[in-house]
Amino acid sequence: MRWSQCYIPTLKEAPGDAELLSHKLLIRAGMIRKLTSGIYTWLPLGLKTLNKAISIIRSEMNRIGAEEILMPMVQPADLWKESGRWDQYGKELLRIKDRHDREYCLGPTHEEVVTHLLRGEVRSYRQLPINVYQIQTKFRDEIRPRFGLMRAREFLMKDAYSFDQDNEGADISYHTMFDAYKAIFTCMALDFRAVEADSGSIGGNFSHEFMVIADSGEDTIAFCRKCDWAANIEHAATLPPQTKALTLEKSMEEVVTPGQHTIKAVSTFLTIPEQQIIKTILYTIDNKPVAVLVRGDREVNEVKVKNMLDATVITMATPEQVHQWTGAPVGFAGPVGFTAGPIIADHELMVYNDWVVGANKPDKHILHVDLARDVQNITFADIRLITDADGCPSCGREIALTKGIEVGHVFKLGTKYSKSMNAFFLDENGEEQLMVMGCYGIGVSRVIAACIEQNNDKYGIIFPPPLAPFEIMLINLDPRDESVVMKASEIYQFFLSEGIEVFLDDREERPGIKFNDADLLGFPIQVIIGAKSLANGIIEVKNRKTGEKSSFSLERFFTDFYSWRDTVYVTWGLS
């Protein structure tokens, strides 16, 4: 491919509404253009990159025996009402009506459609297992679509669905897909981690996320420095207490704390550490009041609370609700005498018995509180966010936190959808059984953005070879010099004959512009030829990832290039 024959509208500056680095670089590199909020057009170079990701994914799906299908993007409301998600999914589900006033939605996912498909086709256990996948456009009506492809409303996704006779078979399907995802992201040369995760709106009882490590990631990942344990911070378990506190001999004491409505203020006012204070946070959970307790220096993990109660909606109480339930303003709520609803305390609070809590009265706290002695209707559970001061829940060793971008998610759904949608088969005894399902997604367009978030520098994108639009940028510095044009054409034809994807910059532009664009586009290898180097009998090459340059003699270029190219692949962990 020659630049003079291509449409690549590069920009010196990104638009003002582009926030995330990948968004800025994709626009500057002429790979995407915004149509409207959260919806983008893929331009030729960007589409070539997207197709690279699709090819890797499709190859691995086919290798494990998954069969490709294509389901409709427009889905009838009846299926979503049957599964119960029509009302649960919320405003992210874009609902439409046809001319006959029938309700539909634009599919954000396809569990209902694929379950409906196979419940009408599968009759016998002999037809199972089945594993199908598609690569198709999805739509989620995000309230504030931001960050370009990272949180778009319309996006490309690979979603796969497995159907098995029993849990044992479902486990095999799950782990087969789990290993396939590891192979996919390894093939893409991405630095990633597979982490334990919450199943969210998809449902199910077991899931893993695949996270690309990047400082700009929205998700926080906890991982062990010694063993293989890793989890999304929302799902990361904390170690249970090894001991429990003895009953406190001191009696409770109410004290005046005027205007001290934060943990820090109470700590300073009473000259006690924040770790001795209990933070009481009130929630409305499925329209019922619940008090949640954590240590003063800790944070509540709302996902854990929601899962513990098997709840659908969790929201923090308003100041008016806090006053209604406790008789006190925000900052003075506490568990002693709280009767508006159940109390859930983090299990860490069992190891100590001399707490300071809000008194449920304005400007007052209570000292010397023993939760086991002084609080009724209390349940202890793991409900806090893990920190890097905690031990690994698997081996007890040191953990660390890092940021990541979710690019894939695998779920063991069980019978959530097959039960609600009556997806039965006849077992070997002729009895009806529910199909056991799994679902597995990769955000294909998101992979490209995540790749760029992980691989960039101040000059532009640094594509790993498997995802680069072209492997080689061949730069002709003197397109008006016939000898340079001929040598560049010779090298260009050589790469094409070897099956190497090469892009020839044959524009009549200044060398500085060509170098800047080459770095912006981020192809892994740059091959540079100009009148000066040609006169000296050399050709220059550059590893875009490391910035290292080398020179080869004209006579030995075609033989020496391959060994040098191997070193470029090694820098990406590829062979």
Swiss-Prot record:
Listed CDD domains: ProRS-INS, ProRS_anticodon_short, ProRS_core_prok
The enzyme's E.C. designation: 6.1.1.15
Any Gene Ontology CC annotation: cytosol
Family: Belongs to the class-II aminoacyl-tRNA synthetase family. ProS type 1 subfamily.
Catalysed conversion reaction: tRNA(Pro) + L-proline + ATP = L-prolyl-tRNA(Pro) + AMP + diphosphate
UniProt protein name: Proline--tRNA ligase
GO biological process terms held by the UniProt record: prolyl-tRNA aminoacylation
Keywords: Aminoacyl-tRNA synthetase, ATP-binding, Cytoplasm, Ligase, Nucleotide-binding, Protein biosynthesis
Name of the encoding gene: proS
Major subcellular site: cytoplasm
PROSITE patterns: AA_TRNA_LIGASE_II
S-S pairs: none
The keyword ATP-binding belongs to this UniProt entry's keyword annotation: yes
Function comment: Catalyzes the attachment of proline to tRNA(Pro) in a two-step reaction: proline is first activated by ATP to form Pro-AMP and then transferred to the acceptor end of tRNA(Pro). As ProRS can inadvertently accommodate and process non-cognate amino acids such as alanine and cysteine, to avoid such errors it has two additional distinct editing activities against alanine. One activity is designated as 'pretransfer' editing and involves the tRNA(Pro)-independent hydrolysis of activated Ala-AMP.
